[in-house]
Amino acid sequence: MIDVIKIRRDLHKLPELGFKEYNTQKYIFDILKNFKCKIHKINTGLLAHFSFNKNKSIVYRCDMDALKIKETNDVYYKSQNDNMHACGHDAHMAIALGLCDYFNNKKDNPYDIGILFQPSEESYGGSKSILDSNILDKINTKYMVGLHLFPKLEKGKLFTNEIIFSSAREVNIEVCGEEVHIANSKNKVNASLIGSKLLIKSLELSNKNNLINFGIIQSGNNRNSLSPSYILKGTIRSKCDDKIILNKLNKLINRLQKKYHTKISCDTSMFLPSVKNDLHLINESKKLINITHLKTTFLQGEDFSLYTNKYPCLFMLLGVGDTSLLHAPSFNFDDSILPNAVNQIIPLLEMD
């Protein structure tokens, strides 16, 4: 049996950003080449296909990429560069390799097994690149399974519901202004002033089902000049249809354009739907393993959602207990839960 804890820690040392997971891909390939599987490389990702001479495949998917975050943990397996596996993808890959090890030693299974190592989950394009490759159709995918580590849920337990993660829409706004010396700024278009009003008013659009917020705010380079632009980059997360909050945002932008006689561009085309699980798969999986029903939809986005639009899917959360939150530079967890996580998932890939 391979050591999934060691694998997780090895991968934690070498975090790489989306579509740049070259060393990560090599590490995984060097393990897979010793198994009785066909290895498909897709960009910086891989798919290990274990044939049991069946005409359909069950696919387990994990993600590979890290974040541009400087780790603050003082552990021997700390990141060796300026990136960090602050979202648990190192653990996801370790679990997937544990599954590879199991099915490599199995004589028969109701279906063929595909273990998918997907690049670039954190930035748009990872799951789309897999779907565009048609590899999932080529192996005749019947259904897909995946999971994500999740803080504040009971350590070692699996959780799911019908809509587990919200939709995610990128919001990119630019307010145009006039670049003049502040001594001559009276009656000029002040992009920073307008943008600040837009920021405050847009945050007020959030409610229990919809969230809008901005992580990037950019304006100006000179302290004594009006900025020619004010840029906001953020996201809308919605537990239901985001058209209502999107419509309110567009109305707010139109009002500010008319009031201040300026141009405000708003691009919201980058969109991931919510992660919707197949009800039949939920019910069947609960007959096999202990999965706790979640009472809420979380506002995280997850590009596994593109798979749920095409195939029956089951996506779960693996609780890691009282840890730092995801995407925090101090995120870490008790990785002794990983071997049992592998054992919990195995029956879901053996369903007839």
Regions found by a protein language model. Name each.
Residues L46, L67-I69, D74-M84, D90-A91, ...:
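Histidine/acidic-residue-rich, glycine-tolerant segments that coordinate divalent metal ions
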Residues L47, N213-G220, I236-S238, I264-N283, ...:
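A short beta-alpha structural unit
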Residues I130, I245-R255:
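Short amphipathic alpha-helices in soluble, non-transmembrane regions
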Residues I194, R223-I245:
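A conserved active-site cap/scaffold subdomain adjacent to cofactor or substrate pockets
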Residues H293-E350:
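Zn-dependent metallopeptidase/amidohydrolase metal-coordination segment
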Residues L11, Y60, H89, I115, ...:
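Divalent metal-coordination and catalytic microenvironments
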Residues M1-H85, A94, D101-Y111:
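Acidic/His- and Gly-rich active-site-bordering loop/insert found
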